[in-house]
Amino acid sequence: MRLALLATLILLPAAASAQARQLTTADSALVGRILLAEDRRDSSDAAIAEGARHSDPRVRTIAIRARGRIRDSRFAARDSLPPVPAPPTWPEPSWRLRLRALTAKSDCNVLRIALADSAWPVRFRATDLLTPACAGDDAIATTLREWVDALPADASRRRAGGVSWHAAAHAGVALARVRPTEALQRMSRLASHRQPQVRAYAARAATVLSDTLRLRTLARDPDDNVKEAAIEGLSKLTAHADDDIYVATLNGRGAQAVRAAAVALKGSPRADVRAATSSAYARWVVLGNASAHDVRAALLEAAGRLATEDRPPPVHAELLPQAVALALGADIRLRVTMAPASGGGSFVVRLRGDVAPLMASRILALARARYYDGLTWQRVEHDFVIQGGSPGANEYVGLSEFIRDELGNIPHLRGTVGMSTRGHDTGDAQWFVNLRDNQRLGRDYTVFAEVVDGIDVVDGILEGDIIASIDEVLPRP
């Protein structure tokens, strides 16, 4: 397969005049049929064979690439494709190098200094590394107490470069490890705070403290992300002693909480669990949400059945507006504007339709439909990626219909934008932005865009920051 692809591509004319030839309406229609065949995963479609024989190298590449992706889910032959423009190169912020240098969990002197760093991501990293080895360091304990005690009643807003709930949440979990008694004294305030992220972190702190009473309360929280964190912690501490809570959670609508409950119920000795989880599975099947596959799989396993019994709804092949133009290299850009309550600012991404036209056109359509407005960046790992665009602010809640992979030859470099998946062809419309070079991700994840402006805003995003809007913008002249 790889040799055949290479041999075919060697025949592609290199002349610039050939690349610049104006395509006809019929040519564009052929590209559209090729893209539809790729989306259907139909390598027998005549459009692919016709495209592979086309006189224009752009059309031939699109057809050959489609055939390769259909036949090989990993598309190992992608490296034999003609090279594409490289993404922009972005320098690292100096603070990330300091963050990266923090590795020793027992070096209390280094961690104490890092807690006073000028960059909050470095402080968070130091906080998250703290262990009981630093229990005797009064300066560290004082800093953690001050952060928790400074938590405002309304922690929904922050200025650029600052924090709102974040410091107190991280400090609460660290204090549970370093000074459990002092953490217990502050748990009531954290666990009842109006900001759901604070309550979720309180559940993690309660897990460290083995505070099962608090976890039982949080497992009934109105926010599904809080429920998820509490159930995961409670099941670790009490095994099946709290199966009543997990069975009751199965009736909820939050995918993440129901999944956590199903995982907790696996192996339960209760006779009613099989029927309860099977009934919940049937309800989730009726919803027809492809992104809820993980929930359905967990429910099947809790019922003593095989997760492979689940069959997500089929992908509906559709040629969206701009897909053909993107495939042929159209420069389409989106501006991601952050909410003022999340520090404001914006960054611009260029869609890489030359490599992932189906995915890029789907993202463009969702942005035009205002799908992302008001959603958050729910996952922030300051030396890895930011991820967001979930209606439930959770990795298990995504678009109701899967988006297929379009693995290509753009490396996952700093500033590239990829599609979140949990398996082949399971794109859920959640973005992730690479904060550093993550080339190992290229094996499984599609790059569909790249940051072309505002990387400093990307670097400054914190967990829970809100996307105000995503709008199409014209390229700069």
Q: What residues fall within each predicted segment?
A:
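N-terminal leader/linker segments that initiate helical-solenoid repeat arrays
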Residues: 18-50, 57-64, 68-69
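Structural signature of alpha-helical solenoid repeat scaffolds
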Residues: 35-38, 68, 99, 103-106, ...
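Hydrophobic h-region of N-terminal signal peptides that target proteins for export
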Residues: 9-18
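Cyclophilin-like peptidyl-prolyl cis-trans isomerases
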Residues: 248, 252-256, 263-477
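Amphipathic alpha-helical scaffolding segments comprising HEAT/armadillo-like alpha-solenoid repeats
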Residues: 41-53, 71-88, 105-116, 135-158, ...
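Alpha-helix N-cap/helix-start positions at coil->helix boundaries
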Residues: 24-30, 57-58, 95-96, 120-121, ...
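Alpha-solenoid HEAT/ARM repeat scaffold
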Residues: 27-34, 61, 95-99, 124, ...
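Sec-dependent signal peptide recognition
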Residues: 2-7
